[in-house]
Amino acid sequence: MELSTCFAYGSLMWPDIMTRVCGREVSALQHTQAWLHGHARHPVRGQDYPGLVPQSGAQALQGVLYTGLTPQDFQRLDAFEGQEYERVPVEVVLEHPATTDGLAPAGAAPAARQKTWVYRYRPEFEYRLEPGDWSPQAFEAQGKARFCARYVGFTQTPAP
């Protein structure tokens, strides 16, 4: 599937982290708020980042949709996410300016939808997921500095 978009729901929601991972300034990339339905975001045991798993009836997850990613960006993202994650296509709901969950208010035109890639936690690693929801606010307040210190050296470009 030829997509140049990626929905970030964890550490990659922060453009400075996405810049480090992609190895180039991503401020030129268009990024907007988006929501993913039918999935849950759980903390990974012993880590500051989350794992995403399908879950029917789950509350919509807010994240960031990056547009304009290159094949080289995806090579680096694939290497960064590693064996615990698989890149899969999903559909996200783009931000509707009148709401906080991306859905259109009654009587308004429906919010736009977009097909995109997301990195989902592989089923064989789900035993590492903790119960509860991963908190972006807690990550920013407590985990981001630790995460950046741990992964600041990520500069490898995988072989083609």
Language model: regions and residue ranges:
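Glycine-aromatic micro-motifs
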Residues: 1-160
